[in-house]
Amino acid sequence: MSLAPGPRNLITDVPGLRVGNAQDLVIKSGVTVMLADAPFTAGVHIMGGAPGTRETDLLAPDKTVEAVDALVLSGGSAFGLDAASGVADALRVMGRGFAVGDIRVPIVPGAILFDLLNGGSKDWAENPYKNLGKQALEKAQQDFSIGSE
């Protein structure tokens, strides 16, 4: 049996998956969001000396939550973890999330990378990553840019 790439040769060749990117040229950083038409199963393997993650513990098979609403990958080191908050806020407005009574709690695990010394301006008054997360979610589609633009 040989495997052949899908029509796009992208992760979005999997039916129902979409990816969105957002970047800020001033801070030289960005966010990528992956979501599906419905909550999906995800897993994680965390490595490195100083990993930065959000809600990744709930991806273990013994946890209550069995699916996630989106995954977020962000620059910005610890500041970038806030990108998942922007995604969660937008998903909640869309009615997505884990049902807790009448409330919907979007499950949005995320991970960051350290890019604070990349030459971009980090002298912001307000953390830009929450908005970048929301922008990336809004841009999610089957065809998306790969890498830095």
Predicted segments with their positions:
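Alpha/propeptide regions of enzymes that mature by internal proteolysis
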Residues: 1-149
